[in-house]
C-alpha cells in the first residue's frame, strides 16, 4: 500500500506451523466432562488432565502419573500422534502455573512410550466370494480398528478383537500370526507399523 508516497511491504518472516483442524465432538465432550475439575488447584488427576488438554488444541488424551509424592508426570497424545518438544514445553509451562498446581507439586511433561506392533493374518474365504472385494473390506475394517487403538493412550492390543475385525462378510476363517496379546500401560501408545493380509485359501463350508 502507498501511504504519503511511501511503499510498505508486510510479510511473514516465520513459517506458520502447529495449526489444527476444528475441534471434534469427542474432544469437546471430554473437555466439558473434565471442566469441573478445573475449579480446584488441589492437584487432582482430572484437573491436571483438563489443564493439559487446554494447552494445545491438538491434544486428544493425557495420562497423569505420580511416580513419587510431589511429582506429576503428564503424557500428552496429539491427534497426529506423539508430541514434539515444543508441545511438551507448552504443557509443562501451562500446568506449572501456580493457579493450576499445588505449590508442592513438580510437573513434568513427557512423551508417551510408543509400543510398536504389526498385524499379519491368513484369511480363508468362502469359495463363492470375490477375493479382492473381501480383502478390501477386511483391510478397511482393520484400519478402523488400528485407528481406534491409536486415538487414545493405554489401549490394549487384543488378538481376539483383531480376528473379529477381520471377520467381515465372506470370510470363513482368520488365522492371526501376529501380534500376541499386549497389555498397554496408561502412558503407552499402541502404534501399528504394518498390516499384512494374506488370502490363504477357500472353503466350501
PLM regions and their residue ranges:
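An aromatic-glycine-centered, glycine-rich loop/turn in mixed alpha/beta architecture
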Residues: 136-205
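A broadly tuned preference for mixed-charge, low-complexity surface segments
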Residues: 24, 112-133, 167-184
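Catalytic P-loop NTP-binding/switch module of NTPases
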Residues: 1-36, 43
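A generic structural micro-environment signature
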Residues: 9, 38, 42, 65, ...
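Compositionally biased, intrinsically disordered low-complexity regions
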Residues: 20-21, 83, 172, 203
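Carbohydrate-recognition loop of C-type lectin domains
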Residues: 37-155
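Beta-strand/loop-dominated core regions that host nucleotide or nucleotide-derived cofactor-binding catalytic loops
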Residues: 1-14, 88-93, 191-202
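Generic structural motif recognizing short loop/turn segments at the entrances and edges of beta-strands
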Residues: 4-7, 70-72, 103-105, 115, ...
Amino acid at each position: 500500500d502507498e501511504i504519503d508516497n511511501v511503499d510498505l511491504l508486510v510479510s511473514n518472516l516465520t513459517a506458520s506451523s502447529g495449526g489444527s483442524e476444528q475441534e471434534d465432538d469427542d474432544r469437546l465432550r471430554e473437555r466439558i466432562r473434565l471442566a469441573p475439575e478445573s475449579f480446584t488447584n488441589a492437584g487432582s488427576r482430572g484437573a491436571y488432565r483438563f489443564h493439559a488438554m487446554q494447552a494445545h488444541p491438538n491434544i486428544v488424551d493425557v495420562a497423569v502419573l505420580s511416580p513419587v509424592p510431589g511429582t506429576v508426570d503428564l503424557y500428552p497424545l496429539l491427534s497426529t500422534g506423539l508430541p514434539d518438544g515444543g508441545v511438551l514445553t507448552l504443557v509443562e509451562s501451562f500446568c506449572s502455573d501456580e493457579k493450576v498446581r499445588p505449590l508442592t507439586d513438580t510437573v513434568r511433561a513427557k512423551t508417551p512410550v510408543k509400543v510398536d506392533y504389526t498385524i499379519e493374518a491368513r484369511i480363508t474365504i468362502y469359495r463363492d466370494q470375490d477375493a479382492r472385494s473381501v480383502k478390501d473390506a477386511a483391510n478397511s475394517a482393520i484400519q478402523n480398528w488400528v485407528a481406534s487403538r491409536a486415538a487414545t493412550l493405554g489401549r490394549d492390543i487384543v488378538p481376539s478383537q483383531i480376528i473379529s475385525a477381520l471377520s467381515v462378510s465372506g470370510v470363513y476363517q482368520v488365522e492371526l500370526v501376529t501380534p500376541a496379546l499386549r497389555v498397554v500401560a496408561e502412558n503407552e501408545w499402541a502404534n501399528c507399523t504394518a498390516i499384512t493380509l494374506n488370502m490363504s485359501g477357500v472353503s466350501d463350508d
